[in-house]
Amino acid sequence: MIHSSMNKYIYTLLIVSFSFAIQIPLNVDTNWEALETNAIVIQWQRYDGFPFCKATKIISSTMEELIQLLEDKENYYKIFERIEYSKLLTSEIVHIKLDMPFPFSGRDYIVKYTKSNIKNDFIYSFEATAEIAVSIDDDYVRLVNASGGWILHPIDDETTELTYMWNGELLGDFPDWALTRAWIEQGNEVMTWIEDALE
């Protein structure tokens, strides 16, 4: 009887956990609204109640080189200039702190990374996790819904289409009217820093 009740309790916990998981549109090709269509294509859409953004660029690099760079999470602060701090809590869970332009507070988040492959594409997705507790720093706004991923699609042996997708929600005191500009800036910055790191 106790065993049966415990099984029901665990099953309920699993259902609740999955019901609150954020759905990331990693394989969604429709309903994206263009924000910028230069060498770096930046788009967004509201999906599962959140403003998801993505930036796509053709990178002169192999998939293997990009994967090695993206998996080096502990050194993200050396790759992405807006990241002030990146600390591995486990092999796949990382705590990241972001610098924000004055007068806004910094942002931080704890996310867990997951690898997957769909046909020839490599997907490195991430989602906020509470598996490891990290104290909140009053100087930072915790992005509790942080999520997104990297999609790597091979063009040829030396060229890769790289897509970076992220939940554009910034919370805190960041004004809604400035979000679109922030998304465009973030998409351009991230792709530029990736290319710089590969040189």
Where are these regions (language model features)?
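N-terminal leader/targeting segments
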Residues: M1-I2, V16-S17, T56
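Sec-dependent N-terminal signal peptides
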Residues: Y9-A21
